Amino acid sequence: EVSITIFDENGEVVVGETPEPEVTPEPTVDPSLPVYEADGSILLTMTFAGDMTIGSNVQSSGTSIFEKELEKQKGDINFPFRNVRDILLADDLTMVNFEGTLTTEGRNPDKTGNEFLFRADPSYVDMLPAGGVDTVSLENNHVLDMGDSGLEETKKTLLAAGIPYASEGEPAILTVKGVKIGSLAYQTFGGRHDELIAKVPGDIQALRDQGCDIVIVSYHWGAEKDYYPNDNQVRLGRATVDAGADLVV
């Protein structure tokens, strides 16, 4: 079959089909290249959020509130962040504390008596970049809800989705607008404040040695329903700043 299109002297189609307009692809931005402001500086807008949980509490029977809402939204992966996604997509870096798991593994046998054990289907990971989340911390009291194998699947799932994670001993390193950013994450359960005061400076220096321009240190700390940091948090936070951290969150 031969398709013939005839144009008049003005370039209008007189016979045949109007050709599809050419689509100019959006230019891709290389994150390793610096983006300068008019004054020669580099401006980075970062957003940090606290505990973020998707999926279900497997200790509860029946369909979870999250699953019911997802069904109501006809599987729309944008619904968890719909009220803030415009903000998170517009910034340069969004980091959250991912408090849960992305796994098909069963309960951690050491935590069967816990009231809350969080698990999300690995496919739900797509909700994070859809909502503007760029990187996560995995230091909290729910990452082991489905045991060591559940945590490992969570890590692999995040990386496969292009989301770097920070966990103790596993810093996340990202480059944004040519700025190399290192992220460290810790939890303080069991009164580890003095241990971390001794440990964290070396971890910060290790990221500096790798060429990080900015070092972010994230702690999962404090007590529920407390509105102010306790003395141990203040000591650890101050020691972290003194050790060279640019941001403590």
Features from the language model and the residues they span:
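Short linear proline/tyrosine/threonine-rich motifs used for host-factor recruitment
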Residues: V13-V15
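Acidic, metal/ion-coordinating pockets
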Residues: I4-G11, E20-V249
